[in-house]
């Protein structure tokens, strides 16, 4: 991640929202450059670390929270759960998300694992921790990303605009007290991981439920269709 001002790295609305943690973002950039200098790589690639914040802040209607990026080289792209279009086979969690997507909405299975269309339509795909060492899950937890992503979520709730948070798993559920401060409704279920998907993720219908809640709040629904 290059040493550049925050307003050159993210969308203008997000630059304002993240201003309280601008120094922390800069410190995380220093941390990542130190990792590279020490011969330790990180994922996703530098230009994608803040990718979730390159889509319009004011247009976010749904928040989907992940834990940290995929640790498999070639998978992480800076949007939670998403992968590059050429990744095959899909990560198991994403395959389970698509199984529920098809069952919930009746759409055919997507042709690839790229969730960019959701990000472009007002879905913030945000990991709590924005980087990871390759093949070392959770290796950057506690290194300093959590205050940044918490600030982002607090900024969303402070808008007092309709927001639906889709919280998959226990880690994501810890955000409920923050989300309760705004005009936000949370949908909770177990994580789509193979370890927990059969314990309540399948059949939870998060996509149609999110749209129903948005409509009840007077907001436009999300077009969840993927190519």
Swiss-Prot record:
Positions annotated as active site in the UniProt record: 68
Source organism superkingdom: Bacteria
SUPFAM superfamilies, per database record: Uracil-DNA glycosylase-like
Subcellular location: Cytoplasm
Gene Ontology annotations for the cellular component aspect, listed alphabetically: cytoplasm
Gene3D superfamilies in alphabetical order: Uracil-DNA glycosylase-like domain
Enzyme Commission number(s): 3.2.2.27
GO MF annotations in UniProt: uracil DNA N-glycosylase activity
One GO-annotated biological process of the protein: base-excision repair, AP site formation via deaminated base removal
Catalytic activity: Hydrolyzes single-stranded DNA or mismatched double-stranded DNA and polynucleotides, releasing free uracil
InterPro entries in UniProt: UDG_fam1, Ura-DNA_Glyclase_AS, Uracil-DNA_glycosylase-like, Uracil-DNA_glycosylase-like_sf
Keywords from the UniProt entry: Cytoplasm, DNA damage, DNA repair, Hydrolase
Name of the top EC class for this enzyme: hydrolase
Keyword Ubl conjugation appears in the UniProt entry: no
UniProt similarity note: Belongs to the uracil-DNA glycosylase (UDG) superfamily. UNG family.
PANTHER family, alphabetized: URACIL-DNA GLYCOSYLASE (PTHR11264:SF0)
Function: Excises uracil residues from the DNA which can arise as a result of misincorporation of dUMP residues by DNA polymerase or due to deamination of cytosine.
UniProt cross-references to NCBIfam families, sorted A to Z: PRK05254.1-1, PRK05254.1-5, ung
Protein name: Uracil-DNA glycosylase
Source organism of this protein record: Mycolicibacterium paratuberculosis (strain ATCC BAA-968 / K-10) (Mycobacterium paratuberculosis)
Gene that encodes the chain: ung
